[in-house]
């Protein structure tokens, strides 16, 4: 092996000798006696003997009854494959960062590939995980039609699968209770209508992600149910679902179209399936100067949403934090439990936390919101949501 120039004072002689011995054994590729190792390395025989005994003791070498030494095949490091939703989505990147950190702490090799919010790419990523023979796949992709294709390819190779936030066949589900997080968002919107507009509402707009399937769509279902529960007088025609696809640009366009078609609506509630879609709605509201006519609640609690909630007069009144910082440790624990043959629930829900703009803007906001207990048993404060 080529050696780069280095100050001899930085070298550890006995460690260099141990590496020389290992290189000889690797080069020969067969068991060798002490004498051969001594001759090939020119290291004193007593030193060779002591190094060999140390390497045997630590499990790097085996010593056979006939006096030969051989390299022990080290167990392969457990490897997880993670198909992240999209490198341009803040929540996806927060989950990825959490998972990377947790994998390092657990000694897990983590291969991260980007699904790019695209079903064809997600299928290709799944094929790559199969080719690399990972021990377990954690899949975070949005398309319900790609889900069975991805799941079948992974299951055909006998690889366990965890699906994040969007269910997949053959997979253990991990993520939020979509209906409940939607219900929390809707309850806050209804409270805002009661306190600000005396309970009067002209329209309730749900920004859906149709491509993600019925479970993710239940976020909007939950929002509508919460609003109907508190504002029982609202007519069914007041509730409108449109597909923002979880994308800012599309959401901005369709919300702008809706507001132009309803110029007399002065009390509009918007529940967004994710913050990215909600921020698109906010863009449209500002461009049309309708800030005083609208209230928005999102999902994920990304940093831009937190910043918006700090802004006085913003129509953004809250976001449900899915606690992305907790995803990594919980996913690693779940993956290891699956590989160890433990019985795990088919649905594994993470905790969520409603973050309200009125609390963030209040003095000593961090004291106003009590800490919560995360999945790893440590206490997390509002700053965890802000980092996510």
What are these regions (language model features)?
Residues 80-88, 99-101, 185-241, 335, ...:
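An alpha-beta-alpha
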Residues 108, 133-136, 156-161, 170, ...:
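Loop/turn elements at helix/coil->beta-strand transitions in domains of secreted/extracellular proteins
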Residues 82-97, 112-121, 143, 175-185, ...:
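Hinge/beta->alpha junction and helix N-cap segments in small-molecule ligand-binding domains
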Residues 76, 215, 323-388:
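Hinge/cleft segment of the Venus flytrap/periplasmic-binding protein
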Residues 81-82, 133-141, 160-164, 203-206, ...:
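Periplasmic-binding protein-like
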Residues 136-155, 223, 243-308:
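Hydrophobic alpha-helical
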Residues 2-75:
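N-terminal helix-turn-helix
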